[in-house]
Amino acid sequence: MDNVANLFLRAKHWQIFVLLVGVGFVGDVVVIVSSISATARSPEDFGKIGLPFGFVMALLMFFFLGWFWSMGSFLSSIVQPSLRLKMGFFRFALVYPGLYIFVFMALFQSSTTNPALLAVIFPLHFFAMFCMFYDLYFVSKSLVLAEISKPVSFYDYAGPFFLMWFFPIGVWFTQPRINRLYAERKTPELSIAARPG
């Protein structure tokens, strides 16, 4: 695991909440202030707020997907190999929404001049939504698999799935479980390393 993943895995629930909600809140304030000042200057300048909005969305997506990548990679590494979900599509499903946000912003700016581009946006957008739901599925199922070490049904991991879907509430319940599993994983490694050789 690299340092970024360890940072997310060790972070307390309130730290993840403050990071993601704080970035969103500060970004929204910046966008609102810039849109008010742009409207006051001229209507043409109002269209330029797409850049700060896109930057805020990309930053928020980066942190959110980084948190999911950290959880998914860690949980997959501690699940029994026979129960482990395949990482290939999970990795793709993390990268695609992050890249899509830039494509969306570029096409959204262009859609005012060419409405036909909206036909391109919809399938790309729905696939990005599918990828986000797959990320929720992967992390929630891997969390329960890591905790109980036996095959699970949707009923078993529906709680974490919906809690992570409704992020502002779910982070308070999900992150402590991640912290516990991470601490359990690190404690045996530390005791083995501390043994005289």
Give the predicted meaning of each segment.
Residues 8, 40-47, 76-88, 112-115, ...:
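Membrane-interface helix-boundary motifs at transmembrane edges
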Residues 62-77, 135-141, 174-175:
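Membrane-water interface of transmembrane alpha-helices
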Residues 13-27:
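Alpha-helical transmembrane segments
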Residues 1-11, 40-44, 180-197:
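Low-complexity, intrinsically disordered extramembrane tails and loops of integral membrane proteins
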Residues 95, 100-104, 117-161, 174, ...:
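Feature detects long, helix-prone N-terminal segments enriched in hydrophobes
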Residues 68-101:
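Alpha-helical transmembrane segments with an aromatic anchor "belt"
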Residues 24-63, 99-131, 196:
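Membrane-helix interface segments in multi-pass membrane proteins
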Residues 25, 60-62, 156-179:
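Hydrophobic, aromatic-rich membrane-embedded alpha-helical segments
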